[in-house]
């Protein structure tokens, strides 16, 4: 047995140093002494004696002092602390409250109400605190005196061991002190809903609204508005004292008082009770004290009391009592450990002490007045959490997603300037603010002005995923598709002579055309607003900027028969080839004209005289018909033209003198020959017209090179051929005289699968044809290839001229001619037998040798045009009727036609696969079909009203393309069905044997643009050239790198993280805090003893409503740089690659080389490429910008308020209660967008199922590696995530509403923070399915005006736009 010894005088040294003078300090001193006195009494080897008493006293020591320290904190205001020794044995605890519902006595016929008592049951939430320390074996020996040898060194070592034990115990005590505060702070945060949620919910219920769909929608709108207004309010308020005070009043009055009425609570020195506690961070506390709040008192009277949960063994009645005073450690040992008295005596003494005067002490406190409440202002950041590894719970993080509109185009009513003198360009320069915007300016972190341009989207669109539409086609064809009018979606194989092709088409398709609606024509006449309407049945097929989706004929290989077979339809997709084929509603004519105006700056422009002369010729209904005959007879032959030069000069000069218009401008071959050979023979003003036309064609051709980067050939084609349609040999000019274009086309790579059908036959090239060999009824594939003067032994199977000859022809016919004719001209076949017969039928009087050639057709009978020589059906009469003066020698040159003739017009149908820059697994089987006429001509202004002209005898209208299908020409052809006359003015009647709209390289939007354009000829030519740039990953790389607007804009999405500082308010005595018996576990080790201290704790809310609330006060700092780092899909996105390996490697290297997110080298064999680490970082973690393709016609106002980046609202908060409403809300565009009832969507390329944006960012497809970690767009597109957020928000609203409503005992209502509050605070954009606009502008001058805070800063200036910040950060300076 151990014998007690006297207390050594040094054992109480540490306790004696504790300052005294208050009750709390007295308790601490007594506890120290009692613990250390133990070591003076015990001297024994019996571990049992040592264990029992030491463990008990150690537990009591930590238990008591941790509670004592906690009572000094402001958090204790919100707590009712209760000792519950049996807490460790409790399996489930419940507390029942009885709440009386207040009544109002009223007069009148109202029924008399009886008192109502509501019973509420709450479950006790169990927790625990743990700490540990260890004592070495040597230290234990010194503490017990076993190792003392009577020397001074031994005594010193014992003293050091005691001090080390004191430090260990003090560390455990500190851990329990801080742990108690941290645990209670977490308890209060767990039951504190955000202020942004609680305020709308209170208004929602206070107004007596019911939980209907209307009320729910109103509530959500109020919730979103409240979140933006109340978040970071302290940071946004600046020095506005009234605003901050009102915000604090809202914060402190949003909660409900506790049902507990403690006998004693915190009070100021004058006895006024404290109403609650406001816990925040040290900077916010300091700012509130300095600038906004009045300190009512600097000290508070704190109760040193606790309650005790007493369990009577007889009846197990649970009672909650208050007022047990902690006076000494002996009381703790008697009451808490039950070591000396029976339970009955303890209960009796507890009840007796309830009547004694409770003990209080005075502590340092900041008591402030907020409204009518006295609040304990507390900041625990430095006091509790300093130098610990535990983060301060009131310092959180919030992810905000921002949306920026890039490259959009203002509608006509928004393109204005407030004052004519503002933001004017330099003198003599055009105003660049009238051009379509290609960049966006905004502020990043530290108010740094950053720029986003279309070039930044290279990492997104210059990727093979742009061409991946297999999933879309497969998904659309899951359900049966109703057959539609196949016109424009069906290509027939040409058969028979060209002269019969148009009539056969009208006969076979007449019924379908008369009764069927042609979708692609109707779409061209829609405004952007009409196109986006829910009643647009075809909106569901507008899914991708690079592809047309349409209802085609199922199971038919094209080209097919004359008419499509009857049967079901199927959704098909074709590559749009060029950006000009984007629907006019999504890429308006005004945008195209503005882009053309921009491209024309600094480049060649045709003179006004040239424009007037050429336009006059195209509009001249009295254009001499004989010119068409001469054009057909020359048939593009340089040799024939030179032979007829005298006649041509006289024709051009005579027409110029009569009308000041230029002749033969409908044939580029003749225009080029005139410039080459007739320079000195024509009047200078007239010659200038032709030279100007050729110069402009060459300038347009140069435009392609200006927007093409240098690079290797891919798939056997130069980069310019992959970038621009006019340079692509696969496209033929609509009218060809020679076979150069066909030969170059046939020489393309085999993967292009270029095929040509010449009237249903394979083409055969013939060198020459004369009157002896000509067969005008030929019906085979022979094509004439002798348009250039050449040697007799020249080969017939290779081109005669350079590639530019064909390119210039295409530019002239597809660009210049539409700009002048505006779609009113028409291609036509030639009846060469009649043409030659008429041209050879002439009367030319013989002129005697030595006589001069007669020059006066009126008086000189020897002149061919003298009335005496005007015989019917002769060419003389035709020249006379056209007022063209020619002489006899000139007419005699027509005799040369017998030696070089053309036989017939041949209809050509050409097909080709996509080029190497667009050829993927999805597109490799797609074919583009284009028609052309060999040996055809172009008819200009219609002349059907002039009965002296019978063009039908020589030509037959045969539209080869919608650009050359003038309604007056087609409808006034012989045997045209009268029922189709009105239709012909709307629908271009092009035979399916010459192509179809959806399979053509140039489609209806280009035709409609030509008709609607208000631009002049110069701007329109550049606009059309810009529209012929291709839409493919390789082509877009050239365009975006060189600064060309691709015809569509982008919605830029960026997510940033912000470190936030929060404020917590809790009502007085709103939480019951149960403290169980602290248990000490002892674990023997080889080197000593480990002690683990565990104390079970529990808590339960004491309110019938929310008794705590939290608010985000300000931003401490942004974690991300708020920058402009563009996404790069080559870092990990998977997609079917380009089939041409060289093109795939070139594109990858080109994109990665210019991207800050380029993968590090070497690329790993497995897994994603890694992002290289840069040498330094200044503004924070890089925030990645992702790009969603968006039509340029999208209303910029959509982005001026919080919006869904998809272009359509999502999330079930808007949805009804029926099954499937959530999905219909997202994808059923037959219903309007709930957030914008006047439209179905703002971006059909992203909001619809299987759309381009959906395929890119929807993780459900697992196609392109969309990641919730790496992609800020993922949460807006993935339906599973959206549904989860919907359920979260729905549950948040339902549970918040039920919690603050009348509660019964039917359920255990805890008044905890509702599920979803974490998402509301940390990721509100995902919860609301909305991103916030930032202050940004397409013009830096507009951005500066917003920064300077101009009173009436305009939001638009011509084509430029400014978007103001509408996020919760509005008003913060970051």
UniProtKB/Swiss-Prot annotation:
Pfam families: Herpes_MCP (PF03122). Transmembrane segments: none annotated. GO terms for cellular component: host cell nucleus; T=16 icosahedral viral capsid. Keywords: Capsid protein, Host nucleus, T=16 icosahedral capsid protein, Virion. The keyword Transcription does not apply. GO terms for molecular function: structural molecule activity. The keyword Amino-acid biosynthesis does not apply. It is found in: Virion; Host nucleus. Self-assembles to form an icosahedral capsid with a T=16 symmetry, about 200 nm in diameter, and consisting of 150 hexons and 12 pentons (total of 162 capsomers). Hexons form the edges and faces of the capsid and are each composed of six MCP molecules. In contrast, one penton is found at each of the 12 vertices. Eleven of the pentons are MCP pentamers, while the last vertex is occupied by the portal complex. Belongs to the herpesviridae major capsid protein family. Homomultimer. Makes the hexons and eleven out of twelve pentons. Interacts with triplex proteins 1/TRX1 and 2/TRX2; adjacent capsomers are linked together in groups of three by triplexes, heterotrimeric complexes composed of one molecule of TRX1 and two molecules of TRX2. Interacts with scaffold protein; this interaction allows efficient MCP transport to the host nucleus. Interacts with capsid vertex component 2/CVC2. Interacts with the small capsomere-interacting protein/SCP. This is Major capsid protein. The gene is MCP.
């Amino acid at each position: 047995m151990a014998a007690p010894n006297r207390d050594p005088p040094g054992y109480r040294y540490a306790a004696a140093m504790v300052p005294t003078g208050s009750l709390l300090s007295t308790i601490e001193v007594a506890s120290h002494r009692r613990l250390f006195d133990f070591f003076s009494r015990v001297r024994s080897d019996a571990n049992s004696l040592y264990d029992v008493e030491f463990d008990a006293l150690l537990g009591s020591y930590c238990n008591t002092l941790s509670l004592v320290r906690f009572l000094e904190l402001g958090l204790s205001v919100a707590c009712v602390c209760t000792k519950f020794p049996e807490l460790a044995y409790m399996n489930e605890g419940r507390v029942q409250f009885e709440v009386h519902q207040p009544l109002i006595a009223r007069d009148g016929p109202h029924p008399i109400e009886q008192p109502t008592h509501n019973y509420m049951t709450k479950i006790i939430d169990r927790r625990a605190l743990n700490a540990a320390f260890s004592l070495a074996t040597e230290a234990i020996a010194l503490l017990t005196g076993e190792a003392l040898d009577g020397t001074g060194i031994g005594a010193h070592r014992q003293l050091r061991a005691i001090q080390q034990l004191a430090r260990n115990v003090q560390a455990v005590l500190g851990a329990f002190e801080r742990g108690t505060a941290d645990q209670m702070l977490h308890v209060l945060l767990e039951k504190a809903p955000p202020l942004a949620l609680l305020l709308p919910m209170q208004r929602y219920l206070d107004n007596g609204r019911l939980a209907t769909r209307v009320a729910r929608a109103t509530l959500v709108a109020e919730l979103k508005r409240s979140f933006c207004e109340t978040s970071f309010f302290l940071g946004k308020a600046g020095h506005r004292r009234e605003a901050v005070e009102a915000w604090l009043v809202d914060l402190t009055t949003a909660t409900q008082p506790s049902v507990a009425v403690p006998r004693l609570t915190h009070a100021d020195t004058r006895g006024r009770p404290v109403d609650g506690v406001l816990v925040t961070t040290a900077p916010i506390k300091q700012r509130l004290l300095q600038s906004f709040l009045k300190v009512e008192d600097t000290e508070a009277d704190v109760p040193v009391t606790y309650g005790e949960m007493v369990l009577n063994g007889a009846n197990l009645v649970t009672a909650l009592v208050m007022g047990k005073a902690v006076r000494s450690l002996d009381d703790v040992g008697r009451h808490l450990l039950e070591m000396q008295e029976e339970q009955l005596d303890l209960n009796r003494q507890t009840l007796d002490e309830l009547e004694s005067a409770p003990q209080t002490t005075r502590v340092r406190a900041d008591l402030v007045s907020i409204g009518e409440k006295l609040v304990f202002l507390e900041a625990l950041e430095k006091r509790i959490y300093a130098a610990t590894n535990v983060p301060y719970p009131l310092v959180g993080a919030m992810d905000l997603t921002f949306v920026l509109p890039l490259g959009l185009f203002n509608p006509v009513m928004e393109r204005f300037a407030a004052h004519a003198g503002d933001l004017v360009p330099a003198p003599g320069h055009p105003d660049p603010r009238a051009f379509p915007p290609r960049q966006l300016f905004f502020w990043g972190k530290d108010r740094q002005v950053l720029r986003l341009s279309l070039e930044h989207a290279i990492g997104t669109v210059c990727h093979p995923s742009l061409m991946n539409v297999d999933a879309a086609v497969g998904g659309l064809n899951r359900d049966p598709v109703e057959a539609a009018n196949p016109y424009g979606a069906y290509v027939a194989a040409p058969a028979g002579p060209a002269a019969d092709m148009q009539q056969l088409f009208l006969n076979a398709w007449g019924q379908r055309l008369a009764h069927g609606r042609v979708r692609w024509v109707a779409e061209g006449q829609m405004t952007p607003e009409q196109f986006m309407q829910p009643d647009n049945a075809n909106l569901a097929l507008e899914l991708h900027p690079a592809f047309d989706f349409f209802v085609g004929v199922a199971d038919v290989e094209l080209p097919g028969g004359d008419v499509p077979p009857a049967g079901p339809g199927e959704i098909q997709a074709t590559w749009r080839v060029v950006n000009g084929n984007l629907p006019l509603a999504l890429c308006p004519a005004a945008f195209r004209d503005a882009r053309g105006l921009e491209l024309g700056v600094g480049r060649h422009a045709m003179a006004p005289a040239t424009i007037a002369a050429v336009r006059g010729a195209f509009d001249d209904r009295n254009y001499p018909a004989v010119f068409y005959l001469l054009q057909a007879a020359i048939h593009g032959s340089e040799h024939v033209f030179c032979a007829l030069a005298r006649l041509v000069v006289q024709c051009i000069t005579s027409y110029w003198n009569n009308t000041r218009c230029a002749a033969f401008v409908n044939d580029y071959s003749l225009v080029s020959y005139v410039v080459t050979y007739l320079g000195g023979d024509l009047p200078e003003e007239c010659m200038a017209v032709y030279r100007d036309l050729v110069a402009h064609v060459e300038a347009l051709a140069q435009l392609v090179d200006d927007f093409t980067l240098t690079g290797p050939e891919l798939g056997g084609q130069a980069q310019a051929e992959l970038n621009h349609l006019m340079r692509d040999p696969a496209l033929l000019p609509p009218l060809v005289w020679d076979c150069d274009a066909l030969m170059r086309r046939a020489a393309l790579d085999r993967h292009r699968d270029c095929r040509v059908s010449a009237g249903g036959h394979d083409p055969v090239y013939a060198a020459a044809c004369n009157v002896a060999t000509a067969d005008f009824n030929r019906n085979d594939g022979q094509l004439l290839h002798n348009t250039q003067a050449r040697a007799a032994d020249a080969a017939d199977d290779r081109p005669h001229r350079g590639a530019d000859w064909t390119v210039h022809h295409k530019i002239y016919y597809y660009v210049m001619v539409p700009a002048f004719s505006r779609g009113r001209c028409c291609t036509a076949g030639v009846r060469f037998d009649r043409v030659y017969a008429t041209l050879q039928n002439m009367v030319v009087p013989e002129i005697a040798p030595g006589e001069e050639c007669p020059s006066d057709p009126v008086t000189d009978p020897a002149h061919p045009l003298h009335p005496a020589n005007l015989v019917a059906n002769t060419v003389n009469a035709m020249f006379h009727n056209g007022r063209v003066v020619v002489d006899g020698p000139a007419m005699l040159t027509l005799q040369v036609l017998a030696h070089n003739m053309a036989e017939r017009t041949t209809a050509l149908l050409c097909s080709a696969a996509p080029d190497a820059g667009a050829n993927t697994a999805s597109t490799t089987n797609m074919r583009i079909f284009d028609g052309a006429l060999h040996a055809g001509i172009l008819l200009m202004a219609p002349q059907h009203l002039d009965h002296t002209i019978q063009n039908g005898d020589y030509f037959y209208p045969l539209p080869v393309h919608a650009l050359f299908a003038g309604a007056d020409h087609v409808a006034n052809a012989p045997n045209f069905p009268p029922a189709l006359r009105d239709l012909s003015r709307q629908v271009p009647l092009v035979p399916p044997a010459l192509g179809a709209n959806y399979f053509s390289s140039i489609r209806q939007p280009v035709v409609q643009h030509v008709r609607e354009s208000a631009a002049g000829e110069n701007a329109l030519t550049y606009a059309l050239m810009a529209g012929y740039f291709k839409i493919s990953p390789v082509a877009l790389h050239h365009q975006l790198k060189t600064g060309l607007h691709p015809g569509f804009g982008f919605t830029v999405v960026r997510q940033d993280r912000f470190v936030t500082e929060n404020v917590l308010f809790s009502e007085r005595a709103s939480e019951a805090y149960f403290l169980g018996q602290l248990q000490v576990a002892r674990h023997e080790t080889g080197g000593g003893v480990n002690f683990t201290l565990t104390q079970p704790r529990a808590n339960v809310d004491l309110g019938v409503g929310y008794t705590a609330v939290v608010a985000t006060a300000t931003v401490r700092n942004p974690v991300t740089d708020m920058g402009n780092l563009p996404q790069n899909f080559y870092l990990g996105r998977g997609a079917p690659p380009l089939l041409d390996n060289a093109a795939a490697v070139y594109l990858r290297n080109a994109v990665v080389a210019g991207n800050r997110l380029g993968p590090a080298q070497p690329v790993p064999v497995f897994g994603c490429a890694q992002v290289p680490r840069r040498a330094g970082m200044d503004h924070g973690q890089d925030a990645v910008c992702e790009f969603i393709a968006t039509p340029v016609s999208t209303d910029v106002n959509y982005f001026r308020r919080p919006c869904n980046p998809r272009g359509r609202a999502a999330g079930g908060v808007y949805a009804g209660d029926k099954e499937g409403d959530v999905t219909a809300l997202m994808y059923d565009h037959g219903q309007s967008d709930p957030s914008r009832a006047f439209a179905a969507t703002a971006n059909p390329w992203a909001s619809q199922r299987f759309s381009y944006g959906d395929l890119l960012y929807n993780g459900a497809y697992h196609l392109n590696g969309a990641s919730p970690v790496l992609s800020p767009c993922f949460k807006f597109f993935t339906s599973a995530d959206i549904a989860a957020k919907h359920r979260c928000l729905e549950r948040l609203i339902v549970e918040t509403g039920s919690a603050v409503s009348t509660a019964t005992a039917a359920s255990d209502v805890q008044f905890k923070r509702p599920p979803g509050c974490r998402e509301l605070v940390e990721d509100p954009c995902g919860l609301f399915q909305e991103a916030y606009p930032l202050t940004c502008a397409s013009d830096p001058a507009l951005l500066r005006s917003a920064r300077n805070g101009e009173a009436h800063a305009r939001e638009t200036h011509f084509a430029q736009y400014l978007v103001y910040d509408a996020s919760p950060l509005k008003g913060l300076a970051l």
